């Protein structure tokens, strides 16, 4: 009977040892499983981020593919507008040419609008350094300081991105008259 009790104790110790080893192994495997799940989730998230970035890059490429082409066309628009500004609508000799230039300019502008190219003509608006380039400052008491008085050249935006800034003259407050030498004395 003593031998049977010893064998049972040995079996219990072996089972307990085997149970602890199995529990330890189960915990290790659960940790490995959790780590593998975490890696899989990260891989899926990384893949989604790469796809999203690629889609954004393609969208930007489509959106701004016309940037260089549009920049090259802006001097043509400027020339047509300048031709209209320097021709008289009353002169019979250039009336038909002027009408042709007006129609050409209108078709050109309509086409550019279809491709989201919009003019920045800030006459009378507050100066915005993000869209305007100040070419000169001029004193003027009739308008608010830092207002656009004159536009030398229109600016343009392509899909909301600045393609060319508007070149403008900006108002400044009149300076106070300097007292003369006689007034100082």
Swiss-Prot record:
Compartment(s): Cytoplasm
Highest rank taxon of the organism: Bacteria
Protein role: Participates actively in the response to hyperosmotic and heat shock by preventing the aggregation of stress-denatured proteins, in association with DnaK and GrpE. It is the nucleotide exchange factor for DnaK and may function as a thermosensor. Unfolded proteins bind initially to DnaJ; upon interaction with the DnaJ-bound protein, DnaK hydrolyzes its bound ATP, resulting in the formation of a stable complex. GrpE releases ADP from DnaK; ATP binding to DnaK triggers the release of the substrate protein, thus completing the reaction cycle.
Record-given protein name: Protein GrpE
Keywords: Chaperone, Cytoplasm, Stress response
A GO biological process held by the record: protein folding
Taxonomy of the source species: Bacteria, Pseudomonadati, Pseudomonadota, Gammaproteobacteria, Pseudomonadales
Database matches in Pfam families: GrpE
Gene that encodes the chain: grpE
CDD domains the UniProt entry points to: GrpE
């Amino acid at each position: 009977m003593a031998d049977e009790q010893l064998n049972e104790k040995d079996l219990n110790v072996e089972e307990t040892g085997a149970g602890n080893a199995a529990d330890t192994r189960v915990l290790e495997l659960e940790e490995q499983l959790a780590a593998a799940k975490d890696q899989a989730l990260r891989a899926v998230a990384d893949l989604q981020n790469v796809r999203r970035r690629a889609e954004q890059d393609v969208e930007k490429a489509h959106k701004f593919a016309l940037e260089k082409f549009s920049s090259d066309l802006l001097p043509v628009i400027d020339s047509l507008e300048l031709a209209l500004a320097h021709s008289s609508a009353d002169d019979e000799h250039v009336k038909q040419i002027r009408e042709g230039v007006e129609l050409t300019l209108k078709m050109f502008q309509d086409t550019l609008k279809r491709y989201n190219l919009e003019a920045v003509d800030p006459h009378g608006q507050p100066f915005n350094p993000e869209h305007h380039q100040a070419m000169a400052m001029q004193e003027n008491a009739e308008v608010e300081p830092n207002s656009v008085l004159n536009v030398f050249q229109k600016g343009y935006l392509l899909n909301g991105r600045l393609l060319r800034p508007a070149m403008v003259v900006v108002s400044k407050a009149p300076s106070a008259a300097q007292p003369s030498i006689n007034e100082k004395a």
